[in-house]
Amino acid sequence: MSGHSKWATTKHKKAVIDAKRGKMFAKLIKNIEVAARVGGGDPGGNPTLYDAIQKAKKSSVPNDNIERARKRGAGEEAGGADWQNITYEGYGPNGVAVLVECLTDNRNRAAGEVRVAMTRNGGNMADPGSVAYLFSRKGVVTLEKNGLTEDDVLLAVLEAGAEEVNDLGDSFEIISEPSDLVAVRTALQEAGIDYDSADASFQPSVTVPVDLEGARKVLKLVDALEDSDDVQDVYTNMDIPDDVAAQLDEE
């Protein structure tokens, strides 16, 4: 029986991982479709589309899926949805601020799913503007270190508008104004430095430190929100201390 139980558990875990992978693929595909619709279907002349395609490739999205999404967005192939960007605001456990970015073809469904995830996981919705002011929209480029120093990266991107370079351990994070994002990633390319992703992102201006139990609750809420097909990104102003992060890694 124990062998069967272990097999069943393994099978369940694989199903969960496969489901998460499928949802991630769908979100990356949506980004490609929208980028092509907004800026045109040529990645060479549309940096947002180029980055969306590269991100999908690095996440092992099949090339056929990528190309079909590009064509749908560019109007070269039928079937493109009318995607709308909507941002919802709320508070999670411990008073942590939460921003939820949705890309949906059904506003009512998206709002309902976000509300349910919030209320079932210790959160609540907030009025527009009551949470957003705690965050700033920034350009964020991430890259593996691969032997590079912080000075190497700074030298490449400083004149392109980079505001800061953060050392994340195995990787670097470059922060800029969203309007300088293309210039920063272009500067990296010209310096022969490969990067993992280049996205506009919300960065918290004020953070809320949490203990282990608080971190668990907020992460559970984030998981529930990200489980919605309409949700593209979830941002919080939670600050997880190093000792708490180490405990979470062990779980």
UniProtKB/Swiss-Prot annotation:
One of its GO terms (cellular component) is cytosol. It comes from Mycolicibacterium smegmatis (strain ATCC 700084 / mc(2)155) (Mycobacterium smegmatis). This is Probable transcriptional regulatory protein MSMEG_2940/MSMEI_2866. The lineage of its organism: Bacteria, Bacillati, Actinomycetota, Actinomycetes, Mycobacteriales. Keywords: Cytoplasm, DNA-binding, Transcription, Transcription regulation. One of its GO terms (biological process) is regulation of DNA-templated transcription. Belongs to the TACO1 family. Its main location: cytoplasm. GO terms for molecular function: DNA binding. It is found in: Cytoplasm. It comes from the Bacteria.
